[in-house]
């Protein structure tokens, strides 16, 4: 008798009901997920781009390809996709908590700005819901709870 692999030992089969399942894609924006904009640009201007190379490599080589696979699967199954963006709606970031507003301003993560947009490799579809949070929690500053219960 063979010993199951670690993955097999902790994996369970399950079925998702597309009518009751949503894929949440959170904070995949240029402000923090693009090495040439927002945080990436800020770190480069500060001479610290090397400190974030691992971060952006992982986003580009691991995170984005896997999110693309999930999007394809959820769209094929007819399940909902909800995008949660993060940033200020007000140009002066006055709608963001005081401890978060400085980084929002420094990365230009303001609604309507290119930095606030979802990274080019991942774009919401016409039937996807996009909710913007102005705090760190999507349930606190968006209609996510209502959308999931609908």
Predicted regions and their residues:
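Active-site acidic carboxylates
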Residues: 1-124
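Internal catalytic-core helix/loop-beta-alpha segment
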Residues: 111-150
């Amino acid at each position: 008798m063979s010993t199951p692999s670690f993955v097999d030992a902790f994996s369970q089969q399950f079925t998702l009901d597309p009518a009751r399942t949503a894929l949440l894609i959170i904070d995949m924006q240029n402000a923090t997920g693009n090495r040439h904009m927002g945080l990436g640009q800020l770190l480069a201007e500060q001479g610290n781009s090397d400190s974030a190379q691992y971060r952006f490599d992982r986003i580009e080589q691991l995170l984005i390809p896997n999110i693309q696979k999930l999007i394809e699967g959820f769209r094929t199954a007819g399940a909902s996709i909800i995008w949660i963006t993060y940033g200020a709606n007000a140009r002066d970031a006055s709608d963001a908590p005081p401890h978060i507003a400085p980084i929002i301003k420094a990365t230009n993560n303001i609604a309507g700005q290119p930095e606030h947009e979802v990274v080019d490799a991942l774009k919401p579809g016409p039937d996807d819901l996009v909710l913007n949070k102005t705090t760190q929690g999507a349930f606190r500053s968006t209609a996510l709870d209502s959308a999931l219960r609908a």
